[in-house]
Swiss-Prot record:
Name of this protein: Uridine phosphorylase
Biological role stated in the UniProt entry: The enzymes which catalyze the reversible phosphorolysis of pyrimidine nucleosides are involved in the degradation of these compounds and in their utilization as carbon and energy sources, or in the rescue of pyrimidine bases for nucleotide synthesis.
GO molecular function: uridine phosphorylase activity
SUBUNIT field: Homotetramer.
UniProtKB keywords: Glycosyltransferase, Transferase
Catalytic activity: uridine + phosphate = alpha-D-ribose 1-phosphate + uracil
EC number of this enzyme: 2.4.2.3
Highest classification ranks of the organism: Bacteria, Bacillati, Bacillota, Bacilli, Lactobacillales
Residues forming coiled coils: none
Annotated transmembrane regions: none
Organism this protein belongs to: Lacticaseibacillus rhamnosus (Lactobacillus rhamnosus)
Any one of the GO BP annotations: UMP salvage
């Protein structure tokens, strides 16, 4: 789990989906 800035929340969501593949 990474601590990210709310501003990059959208990017984080995409990254999490790409890394975790949770879709």
């Amino acid at each position: 789990r990474l601590k990210v800035i709310p501003e990059k929340l959208k990017d984080v969501k995409l990254v999490c989906t790409d890394v975790f593949g949770d879709n």
